[in-house]
From Swiss-Prot:
It comes from Aspergillus fumigatus (strain ATCC MYA-4609 / CBS 101355 / FGSC A1100 / Af293). Belongs to the class I-like SAM-binding methyltransferase superfamily. Cation-independent O-methyltransferase family. Keywords: Methyltransferase, S-adenosyl-L-methionine, Transferase. Its EC number is 2.1.1.-. Pathway: Secondary metabolite biosynthesis. GO terms for biological process: methylation; secondary metabolite biosynthetic process. S-adenosyl-L-methionine binds at residue 283. Disulfide bonds: none annotated. Gene3D superfamilies: Vaccinia Virus protein VP39 (3.40.50.150), Winged helix-like DNA-binding domain superfamily/Winged helix DNA-binding domain (1.10.10.10). This is O-methyltransferase xanE. One of its GO terms (molecular function) is protein dimerization activity. SUPFAM superfamilies: S-adenosyl-L-methionine-dependent methyltransferases, Winged helix' DNA-binding domain.
Amino acid sequence: MSTQHGPKSTRTNDLYELAVNISSTVEAFVGRLDAIGAERPNLDNPFPEIIQDEGAQLARLKILRLCERLMALVQGPVQWLMFQNMAFLDAACVGAILDMGIHDIIAPGPEPTSLDQIVEATGASKDILKRIMRVCTQRLVFDEIAPEQFIHNGVSLQFLAPPVQALISHACDDGLRMAAHFTDSLKKTDWKGSDDPENTAFSLAFNTNKGLFDYFYTEDLARGQRFALGMAGSEIMKTLTEDMFPFESLPQGAKVVDVGGGRGHVSVRIAEKVPGLNFVVQDDESMLEAGQAEGVPKAVKDRIEFMPHDFFNEQPVKGADVYLLRFILHDHSDSRCAKILSNIVDAMEPGKSRILIDDAIVPSFLGPESSRFFNLLDLYMLAGLNGKERTLEQWNYLIQMVSPKLVLEKVWKTPNGGPESGTILELRLQE
């Protein structure tokens, strides 16, 4: 299957050539899905399968790039720029329907809900509602099957899952506020950026000298609760840690320290899968208390310890077999990541201990060929936390910042995993 990544594959200005290229790539994509027994895309399916296969992912990324090129070519440069740079209103409209609870007012199923019913339930202006719903349905959020008659589709049904609703609501509210202050935050640093998590677009947007996490969990608790629930919603897009690294290969009784492990969900999952391992979940005390309040399954309770710990301080657990960092380092700048890793390195036992970094490795494609999802997530990390998503080269740079003895031994992923699949970087200390 051809998955060419050179500029010529997507930069044509010939409309017919572009259409033929899209058609052939779709054929290759569907053929690959059929070959691996995966579901074909269907917007009416609210729970689509996450495809990890490299060939399918490469074809999918190419289709997305080609379709973007097609839309730009048909619209023309000026209209394309206007459409792209007014897209913030799409997010604003989705945020509005979530705030009004329209996703709950429109009943699941084939029977439509009228605009008048939505007006009655919300008390909102019919004129404004109609204009908001027009934008949403055009962006495939709900279907308007007759004038002012709306039903759910596979996209809008996602909002009925509270974690997904919280994730999208956070993006449409907090995310838009951060985006509005993005350039101002960079101007403050003369466009050089900052390592300080309190000197961000987020801090400008909320007029605070606190970082995102501190603000959400100490000042605006309602936003903090939504954010925490939304982060749980983001889990549906992530590859399971235990599906990438063979924890069963660790020695019987091995100790895994889940650094910044939140409520302990990942440790519980791995403990249930691999009976011979012991876990220490480290995080803020309030986070750990929330995890314990939710309850730990009886079958693994004796093998999971909860330990309050700030990973910017000395690591108290010495010589563990594994120090796991799952989606921690992308929240931080290189200098802060180096501090986190250095504290772990000081606790490691050469020849025994390893660090497992469960985090994204951004593909090193040319800009036009790269993943838009990773690009936007990277800038979200910058705007909110002064963090970043990293390429393999950037990961290696960070590792060398920590210690010349710290080496990347292996990158783990699911079998045949592609550029958008999860990855685990295994780090060891040279003796």
